[in-house]
Design a protein with these regions (language model features):
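Helix-turn-helix
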Residues: 7, 11, 15-49, 53
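Short, basic, alpha-helical segments at the C-terminal edge of helix-turn-helix-like DNA-binding modules
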Residues: 56-62
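Charged, amphipathic alpha-helical oligomerization/scaffolding segments
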Residues: 57, 84, 88-91, 115, ...
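Secondary-structure edge/capping motif, primarily at the C-terminal ends of alpha-helices
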Residues: 66-69, 96-103, 135, 159-167
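Hydrophobic alpha-helical connector segments
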Residues: 67-94
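Hydrophobic alpha-helical bundle segments that form small-molecule/ligand-binding pockets
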Residues: 120-152, 162, 166-167
């Protein structure tokens, strides 16, 4: 059996994913976890504490994926990384659908997330640098690499949100991969 704090955060994650952050109260989380609000408050002072803990989990998992990915970012590693990111985004979908609301309501998360996005951008740029140096991509200037890294990172971070806004039925891993590789494909060299 899971420790109570982890059980509560897992149930909160399910509630946020299903209903959105703004629509979930502590009572909903307590009911889902089969604990009293008082018992929940023993582990998490308030909803802010739960969201903060979930963001830390998400960020840590993303950093692990990016750290593993940057060791040798060959195309099969890039694809494996993208599949893992898709799965991670699925598990924490509330964050990607409610990003702006969360960042407005939780300034400390906004600060940490901004730092994380900058780090993520540099990791993607490093992947581009590596693949350009091995001849898999055409030559790009520093500014072009940064812009391409920004486009990839933006698509990765916002893809779910856009698919939901469009009310599309294409919210699949296959379509996610197709969109990201579609950004990269024009930059493949003959070798790539």
């Amino acid at each position: 059996m899971k420790p109570t704090k982890k059980h509560i955060s897992d149930k909160a994650l399910n509630q946020f994913n299903e209903n959105g952050v703004v629509n979930v109260r502590l009572q909903h989380i307590a009911d889902a976890a089969f604990v009293s609000v008082g018992h929940l408050a023993y582990h998490f002072k308030n909803k802010d504490g739960i969201i903060d803990a979930l963001y830390d989990e998400l960020k840590t998992k993303q950093e692990i994926l990016l750290t593993e990915f940057r060791i040798v970012p060959l195309f099969e590693d890039v694809n494996r990384y993208l599949k893992s990111i898709y799965q991670l985004h699925s598990a924490y979908i509330f964050f990607y659908l409610d990003t702006l609301e969360i960042l407005r309501a939780y300034p400390t998360i906004q600060t940490r997330h901004s730092q994380h996005l900058r780090w993520q951008l540099m990791q993607i740029k490093t992947m581009l640098d590596f693949n350009i140096s091995r001849g898999a991509f055409i030559f790009l200037t520093y500014q072009q690499r940064l812009q391409l890294a920004w486009q990839i990172r933006s698509m990765v971070e916002m893809w779910r949100y856009m698919v939901r806004i469009e009310n599309s039925e294409n919210e699949t891993e296959e379509n996610f991969l197709y969109c990201i590789w579609g950004i990269l494909k024009p930059f493949f060299s003959d070798m790539g």
